[in-house]
Amino acid sequence: MTKTQMNYIAGDWVSGPTEIENINPSDLSEVVGVFAQASSDQLEDALDAARRAQAEWATYGLERKQNVLMAIGNELMARAEELGTLLSREEGKPLAEGKGEVFRAGQFFTYFAAEVLRQIGDTADSTRDGIEVDVRREPLGVVAIISPWNFPTATASWKIAPALAFGNAVIWKPANLTPASAVALSEIISRQDIPKGLFNLVMGAGRDVGQRLVESPKIDAISFTGSVP
């Protein structure tokens, strides 16, 4: 029996009320995996956990954040062959492209790990006597990330890495056509030194989980790549 792959919410792997099978498009006899679909209550749990965790993450020093992103990137690059093969099985992409995509995803994380240490502000004179202008960047808060199936690891990493690097929490809804790659990336992130709830994986259909996510007042920013009906 195929083990059900679960959502990652508030620091725990949790099952859902329904499941879907993911089939290898180049071999329809192969079930890549069975994946839990998040409920509306579980999405609310993820949103609340993300809000709490983001406040804690914002207190982490820059080097500590850099270490987290660097570790994610290094593991992705080291496991590019393994995870690229998984990506190709569920999406149908040639093996060389699947492996290259995972390696590139790792580079996104190491790039933004370096950017963590380059965060700078600015000061300027005011037009008023005795006043200084202080310019600084602050986290947005909780970011919803909705990513596509055609580059399931690279596009998601391109969004997740900068969101985490600059102090935000993440709720990620991947495309339902490529959940195995999403679980693999989430498993790497889940093992890092981050607050519980800072990163959440909520799998499900766009018309259900995605729609509720973008309409939620608990979301401060949305990064979306894909299409809508």
Language-model features: where?
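Glycine-rich loop-to-alpha-helix module at the N-terminal edge of alpha/beta enzyme cores
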Residues: L28-Q119
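Terminal low-complexity tails and localization/encapsulation signals of metabolic enzymes
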Residues: M1-V34, N67, A71, G121-I146
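Rossmann-like NAD(P) dinucleotide-binding subdomain of oxidoreductase/dehydrogenase enzymes
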Residues: G121-P229
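Histidine- and aromatic-rich ligand-binding microenvironments
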Residues: N7-I9, E21, G33-E44, D193-L198, ...
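Hydrophobic residues in alpha-helical segments
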Residues: Y8-I9, Q54-A58, L76, L164, ...
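Short N-terminal micro-motifs specific to bacterial/archaeal maturation
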Residues: E19, V34-Q37, E56, N74, ...
